[in-house]
A protein has these predicted regions:
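Residue-level recognition of single "structural anchor" positions
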Residues: 1-147
Length: 147
């Protein structure tokens, strides 16, 4: 899980690529909020690549600083309205600006250390979006379990 791709896992564990991919396909990892209501959430986005460097995919996610958990995330275009309508459909709370983003920016760094597909100048990317989402689901579940 520490920044290892499918071929790295094959080499370390001695499994075939097909076996590792089958395990990813069967994976049921999902993040689930541990609370019904959060007092403050920080939201940020960053891009990753699927297939090739020209194909950017945006990840928009919500982070709770006090628990260190990733509460929700959505993949899509870098469209603020679409992201907030999807993730925070019921939210009527006030929004806080960029002055309070130190924690989530630090979390972005932690994500980049854990998931190689999130590294800015990486040669590691998923060919199909399906595997990309599976790897991030596992990575986020792992990050949440560590907190």
């Amino acid at each position: 899980m520490e920044n290892d791709g499918i071929r790295d896992i094959c080499s370390i564990a001695g499994y075939s690529k097909d076996k590792v991919q089958a395990a990813l396909q069967r994976s049921k990892h999902e993040i689930k909020p541990t609370q019904k209501h959060y007092d403050v959430l920080q939201v940020d986005e960053f891009h990753t690549f699927v297939g090739h460097k020209k194909n950017k995919v945006w990840l928009i996610y919500a982070y709770h600083q006090k628990t260190g958990q990733i509460v929700a995330f959505v993949w899509g275009k870098r469209d603020l309205k679409t992201a907030f309508d999807t993730v925070f459909a019921d939210a009527n709370e006030r929004w806080v600006g960029k002055q309070h983003t130190k924690a989530i920016e630090g979390n972005n760094c932690a994500i980049r250390h854990r998931i190689s597909r999130a590294v800015r100048k990486s040669c590691c990317f998923s060919k199909p979006l399906f595997y990309h989402i599976k790897v991030f689901n596992i990575g986020f579940a792992y990050i949440n379990a560590c907190h």
